[in-house]
């Protein structure tokens, strides 16, 4: 594909976003694994005062880095690849919406419960985010299949990475929990703990690889 020229160093921005995402995704994975194992960073006298700050930074980075990477990827695409442009725009829209809704819930700008029931506004916003999440998964899969079939080199590797993300989402969020519940029942806590660990490691690895491949495409 023909590449554009830019007045700002978008490669450097994409590089920082990719590294930040990888670092904090691994930190989030370690945090979750420790929590599953019954450990906590808050028991450390060194990390007690800074752990809330780290968690806040982690949440912001994991929400904002995908916006930057997908936005830059969309910006670098030529006009001829309309399908990829539309899929990228959907991904940016989803991550922006998720960030806004996340901040609304975290800052208590939206009332979640009233008289022991979920408020109508909270239900609408949650449904909207879930719907956009499903649409973004489909858009990511469509983009991945298109990249695999129509392109070569780093673009094709990015397509494979996006397909792997979809497979990880399908297995870890849908098939694996149902299988574990069917086989082990709801009394085998060890089975669910093991499933959660496998899901977290698989999903984190898939996303890190996908954003690395996206950075490689942007860097061309």
Describe these PLM feature segments:
Residues 21-39:
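Alpha-helical transmembrane segments of multi-pass membrane proteins
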